[in-house]
Amino acid sequence: MNILEFIQKFPDEDACRLKIKEQRDQIGVICHKCNCKEHFWLENKQCYECKHCHSRQSLRSGTVMQNSKLPFRYWFVTMHLLTSTKKSFSTEELRRQLGHKRYQPIWEMVNKIRDIMGKRDNEYQLTGQMELDDAYFSTEIPQEQKDKPLKRGRGSQSKTKVLVMAESEFVDNPKKGRKPKRVNHIKMQVISDLKSNTITSVVKEQVDKTTELVTDDSTSYTKLIEHVNSHVAKVIEPDMIPVILPWVHIAISNAKRLFLNVHHNIKTEYLQYYLNEFCYKFNRRYFGEKIFDRLLISAVSYAPDFKSKIYNRTLCG
């Protein structure tokens, strides 16, 4: 929906609160103590009460807004802005649009939303024909490494390793100028190293066993055949990358350009949240106006695990 439709649909705090309650009622409220699925709604307290053990939980409990003191409308506006464009918004721009004074609560809110985006995508595994490769994303140099000489190449302190996976299949009679493959879903996962065991564990978790996998001939991928239907490892010349692994490298290039243009000095420990947002929106690129509704469902279905490293605790914002 465009901005005018959004304002008409959610004009105030009450409209946003009612929408959250509507979504929670549709999905179902589960008691945190006895797992009972039957609840009363206490209008005067604005909370649910379990019919069995009479424990109560707030409207925000178990959602992305859990423990947050920010207005419901902040969350709605942020989710709308994040999903209304192919690109993203910096936290500073979101703070300015919301008219909030402090940066920190808005930054935490946005990363909590990115966290549940990742949780939703982790419900699914990639399948079919798939490309896989690793990439190095530029990140902020850790504080303890800033006084040390900067290494060059892949071992640089300013680079973070990411495993990139893309479902793709060859197209019959591709049109002139088009890619020989078409892409479906992608996943990106920050990894600590390129050891075979590390990559294999990620693939085992994120990829279905029936997958037909295509990679380069790196020794990091030698054990992947144990967890997929077939694995083709090719020696790929640079000029053949767009033919053999096109969508992995298109995704890498697009993500790097987005982060460079919109976000600056991303820390390694937060890179995964930015990748979550990129993959979530890429995987739903044909949803159109429905992407906001889908994100809203995820927002009431998952509580975030995001923790601020600044204070080393989950913050309420």
Each language-model region and where it sits:
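Residue-level recognition of single "structural anchor" positions
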Residues: 1-317
